[in-house]
Each structure stands twice: as C-alpha cells, then as structure tokens.
C-alpha cells in the first residue's frame, strides 16, 4: 500500500472529484470561518455529494463542540474529524463512538511533542509546523525527519510545506502513513491547481521507498 494522500481545503466540487480521479485517498473541508478555505454547509454538501460514496471526507475543526461537529457530519456528509485546537480526549472518544474517525493535529516548532501525542488516543495524529493562526495551509516546512519517531508509535499524517517538488524527500525523512497537502497544490488559497495535484500524487506514489504505511483515512 502506498502512503495515503489527503487534499485539504477544497472549495469546488468538480476539483474535489478530480482529486479522486487522480488518485487522492481523502479530501478535507475546512469549517473554520477565519480560513480562506472555509466552506459553508451547502457547499460542503455539494463537494461531498460529488465524491464516491466510500471516499473519506474529513472535516477540519478548531475548538468546536461535539454537537457542532456531529451537525456537520449529518448535514454535509463528513465521515472524519480533524481536530486542530485544544480538543479534549473526551470529545475524541465521543466522536469515535458515534462513528466519526478522529485525527488529532499537533504542531511542531523545533520538534514535535512526543509525550502529548502518545497520551492522546485517536485514529491518527497529524503533525505540521506551528506559527500561524490558521489551521493548515500555511506552507511552512519543518524538520520532517523528527516525525519518524511518531510514526513508530502511532499512525502519522504528515503536513506542513509539502509540495510536488519536496514530497519524495518528506516521505524518505518521516516515513509517514499519510500526507496532508493544501497550499502546496494551490493556484491561490482554496483554489487547487490540478496540475500540481497530479504531480504531487505521482511523486508521492512513485518514490520506490520500501515500507508499509498504515491506513489513516477510511
């Protein structure tokens, strides 16, 4: 199995569908109003309806309640929640009990907080560079190699500064189970450049690196 790929911050149903045609494993929809990639419920529903029924559809949330997240799942078709704030373990447990897979985001400055990650129980953790107010799409690369210790402990989704040119090196450095890319495949915030998406997926799946990634998006 190749490393899984999530294209995050989709705002257009046709481009979301094309991402899957090109080989993406999941898409991400941002429900955080300050983000330039924020989607309202009606658009999120359109995007989810344009995708294969079995496709993982990941909602990105920041410090939202259980009720808010479940409302988006019911109204828009979200099947997983990516938590980018200070969400409690109790919230993650409630979501998973309700059938919503949880990915917990952590932020790396000089190095990731291994202790916090190993103490938090979720389907997987996502690690990207800290330093911005918005969740994801910050185009900030970091020392991906430091994440290899995480992937030895739990499923890891790698994010932060990924693009078609550096994705092969990122995989070699971190040996992640999944990749999460947003700004690195965009023409402008929220507008995906489908040529970049195609090259990103090709380069990520043709590295020739021999390891066995675990499934993060399902």
Curated annotation (Swiss-Prot):
<keyword id="KW-0413">Isomerase</keyword>
<dbReference type="InterPro" id="IPR011060">
    <property type="entry name" value="RibuloseP-bd_barrel"/>
</dbReference>
<dbReference type="GO" id="GO:0000162">
    <property type="term" value="P:L-tryptophan biosynthetic process"/>
</dbReference>
<keyword id="KW-0822">Tryptophan biosynthesis</keyword>
<keyword id="KW-0028">Amino-acid biosynthesis</keyword>
<protein>
    <recommendedName>
        <fullName>N-(5'-phosphoribosyl)anthranilate isomerase</fullName>
        <ecNumber>5.3.1.24</ecNumber>
    </recommendedName>
</protein>
<dbReference type="Pfam" id="PF00697">
    <property type="entry name" value="PRAI"/>
</dbReference>
<dbReference type="InterPro" id="IPR044643">
    <property type="entry name" value="TrpF_fam"/>
</dbReference>
<dbReference type="InterPro" id="IPR013785">
    <property type="entry name" value="Aldolase_TIM"/>
</dbReference>
<keyword id="KW-0057">Aromatic amino acid biosynthesis</keyword>
<comment type="similarity">
    <text>Belongs to the TrpF family.</text>
</comment>
<comment type="pathway">
    <text>Amino-acid biosynthesis; L-tryptophan biosynthesis; L-tryptophan from chorismate: step 3/5.</text>
</comment>
<dbReference type="InterPro" id="IPR001240">
    <property type="entry name" value="PRAI_dom"/>
</dbReference>
<dbReference type="GO" id="GO:0004640">
    <property type="term" value="F:phosphoribosylanthranilate isomerase activity"/>
</dbReference>
